[in-house]
Curated annotation (Swiss-Prot):
Belongs to the class-II aminoacyl-tRNA synthetase family. Gene3D superfamilies: Bira Bifunctional Protein, Domain 2, Nucleic acid-binding proteins. This is Asparagine--tRNA ligase. One of its GO terms (molecular function) is asparagine-tRNA ligase activity. The keyword ATP-binding applies. Keywords: Aminoacyl-tRNA synthetase, ATP-binding, Cytoplasm, Ligase, Nucleotide-binding, Protein biosynthesis. HAMAP family: Asn_tRNA_synth. GO terms for biological process: asparaginyl-tRNA aminoacylation. Homodimer. It is found in: Cytoplasm.
């Protein structure tokens, strides 16, 4: 018995007249007056289901085949034949249909309807991958993930597993989830009345990580070129289409590198993964272009063929001021540019992806390298047409005295970062890196307007179901 994924049958990998068994779920069943049933069967391997033509002379035709409903799982054996119908080249002439699992009540099955709102699907996140849209998102997400790993492997980078539990705040923002095994009903206290974290599991305050960057720096200062790719957590009370409490980050870190080096790396990586998804998941992208965002494919094709523009933050602010545009958020030097500012630069002024560099130090993190002007740091953001910021990065401050001064300036005790300071004490080197929010990348590729719909089980304020 040869089991075959639906994708292999539909793509023509298997010869006509060969006998195969496909395993999957019923998308739909249609019965003809001629005593034939047409089953649309999907297994997730590709966007399209395969049509199985089932004759009424099968032993279980009346008592099982005619009772199949959306969601039932089946194994169908038959011969691959050329399809006379429009839409696909091959179908299955069934000789055996085995029902593996029934849907208990077809009337109340949450996925019974052919179309559901995106909002409704969030309420049934455990079932939503069975839909066309979320199934396509999952395949695109996988393709992008594999392409990222492949890109860095080909470039000679080592993947580093950054810890999820940390005592460090990489962003200095303080919006962190605390990790504790203390009894919340009976907290141990110090003489001063504060919670005594010496009694906790790790003997100190610990949190879920907001970034793997600091740990990646340690490994870059030994392996030269590394990257992390894993979940990160922010306790931001933000109910927006761009924010999640749990999301994935891609964070390369490069020793003996400056800001321009990682700016080029960011451009090369984005173009590489976009080319990969255009080649490998064309069927899913065509669905997104048809149903979600008409520009889904065009946007990616234009992106990979564009030369990135580069502009200093100070010049970008002047461009915004000279535009004559009335923005919702006023423009002045020193602001952290909002999405409307970023999109104006990428979509209307440069009409291409743009890298903005050298931001004011007061709106950036403590670890970013101070520029000679004393006002700006060697930071960058990559702005993409259609979404705005998609990558943020910087050259790291490798000079211990400057790093210490910067931490004190921002209210961070250097002694609490002693291990991070050691990287500057023992063989310091210029190094740089960036962070890519993976869900924003998936959202950009698919055209899905909300990051809650491009991660399997979204974690947001007041919501941690499933």
């Amino acid at each position: 018995m040869t089991y075959a994924p639906v994708s292999d049958v539909l793509s023509g990998k298997l010869a006509v007249d060969s006998e195969v068994t496909v395993r999957g779920w019923i998308r739909s069943r249609r019965d003809s007056k001629a005593g034939i049933s047409f089953l649309a069967i999907y297994d997730g391997s590709c966007f399209d289901p395969i049509q199985a033509v089932v004759p009424n002379n099968l032993n279980n035709y009346d008592n099982e085949v005619l009772k199949l409903t959306t969601g039932c799982s089946v194994e169908v054996t038959g011969k691959i034949v050329e399809s006379p119908a429009q839409g696909q080249d091959f179908e299955l002439a069934a000789t055996d249909v085995k029902v593996v699992g029934w849907v208990e009540d077809a009337e109340t099955y949450p996925m019974a309807k052919t179309r559901h709102s995106i909002e409704y699907l969030r309420e049934v996140a455990h079932l939503r991958p069975r839909t066309n849209v979320i199934g396509a998102v999952a395949r695109v997400r996988n393709c992008l993930s594999q392409a990222i790993h492949r890109f860095y492997h080909e470039q000679g980078y080592f993947w580093v597993s950054a810890p999820l539990i940390t005592a460090s705040d990489a962003e200095g923002a303080g919006e962190m989830f605390r990790v504790s095994t203390l009894d919340m009903e009976n907290l141990p206290r110090t003489d001063a009345g504060k919670v005594d974290y010496n009694e906790d599991f790790f003997g100190k305050e610990t949190f879920l990580t907001v970034s793997g960057q600091l740990n990646a720096e340690a490994y870059a200062c030994a392996l030269s070129k590394v990257y992390t790719f894993g979940p990160t957590f922010r306790a931001e009370n933000s109910n927006t289409s761009r924010h999640l409490a749990e999301f994935w980050m891609v964070e390369p870190e490069v020793a003996f590198a400056e800001l321009d080096d990682v700016a080029k790396l960011a451009e090369d990586m984005l173009k590489y993964v976009f080319k990969a998804v255009l080649e490998e998941r064309r069927d899913d992208l065509e669905f997104f272009a048809q149903r979600i965002d008409k520009q889904a494919i065009t946007r990616l094709e234009q992106f990979v063929s564009s030369d990135f523009a580069q502009v200093d933050y100070t010049d970008a602010i002047q461009i915004l001021l000279d535009s004559g545009r009335e923005f919702e958020f006023p423009v002045e030097w020193g602001i952290d540019m909002s999405s409307e500012h970023e999109r104006f630069l990428a979509e209307e002024h440069f009409k291409a992806p743009v890298i903005v560099k050298n931001y004011p130090k007061d709106i950036k993190a403590f670890y970013m390298r101070m520029n000679d002007d004393g006002k700006t740091v060697a930071a960058m953001d990559v702005l993409a047409p259609g979404i705005g910021e998609i990558i943020g990065g910087s050259q790291r401050e490798e000079r211990l005295d400057v790093l210490d001064a910067r931490m004190r300036e921002m209210g961070i005790d250097p002694e609490h970062m002693s291990w991070y300071r050691d990287l500057r004490r023992y063989g310091t080197v210029p190094h740089a890196g960036f962070g890519l929010g993976f869900e924003r990348l998936v959202s950009y590729v698919t055209g899905m307007g909300n990051v809650r719909d491009v991660i399997p089980f979204p974690r947001t304020p007041r919501s941690a179901n499933f």
